[in-house]
Structures are given as structure tokens and as C-alpha cells.
Curated annotation (Swiss-Prot):
UniProt entry keywords in alphabetical sequence: Antimicrobial, Disulfide bond, Fungicide, Plant defense, Secreted
Gene Ontology cellular component list: extracellular region
Compartments where located: Secreted
Tree of life domain: Eukaryota
One of the GO BP terms on file: defense response to fungus
SMART domains: Knot1
Residue pairs linked by disulfide bridges in the UniProt entry: 3-49, 14-35, 20-43, 24-45
Organism: Clitoria ternatea
Signal sequence, renumbered to the chain: none
Name the record gives this protein: Defensin-like protein 1
Role noted for this protein: Possesses antimicrobial activity sensitive to inorganic cations. Binds specifically to the fungal plasma membrane. Has no inhibitory effect on insect gut alpha-amylase.
Family: Belongs to the DEFL family.
Amino acid sequence: NLCERASLTWTGNCGNTGHCDTQCRNWESAKHGACHKRGNWKCFCYFNC
């Protein structure tokens, strides 16, 4: 089961899901990451709950 959290290391709009995914995995030890529009485009990281 994965839990979503806004990235703590991403700044600005998220326009590249691949980069968001790499940054979440490499910098925040997440399982993966993706860009989602929540007001504006943000990078969200996904972790084991």
C-alpha cells in the first residue's frame, strides 16, 4: 500500500514526471514519484505506508 506526500525537495512547477520520479527515489527514498495538478503542478512522492 502506497501513501502520497508532496515532495520535500522539489521546487517550482512539476512538468517532468520522470525527473520527479528520479528525485523522489534518489533524494527522499520513495518508491516512486509523479507530477499531479493540485492547484498547480506539484511533484508527489509515494512511500510504503
